[in-house]
Amino acid sequence: MHTVMWMSYDLGVKGDYEGLYAWLDDHDAKECGNSVAFLRYEYSADCLSELKEDIARHVNLDKRDRIYIIWREAQKIRGQFLFGKRKAAPWVGFGAQEVQVDEED
């Protein structure tokens, strides 16, 4: 079986980009802008588990590294962190905010 997906990655300044780039190249991934790739991934049973194990075998990751994938499953678009977790967005506070009134009940 196979699926197509977008992968976003943030390995920081000391990350194993060489290992990740070799893995992406081995999977004929296409570059889609800064730290984003598009690829087709072949798997036998459980795509996410196999993908996570495959990347972990080829890329030296630490606890701060993040890899997020976006794929289609059963006519829905899904996204999930394979490694790492969501951080506070850098754009928080730049948009128009409603004025909040503090009052005592």
Residue ranges of predicted features:
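Phosphate-ester processing/binding pockets and catalytic centers
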Residues: 1-3, 14-105
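Active-site-flanking beta-strand signature of metal-NTP-handling nucleotidyl enzymes
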Residues: 5-9
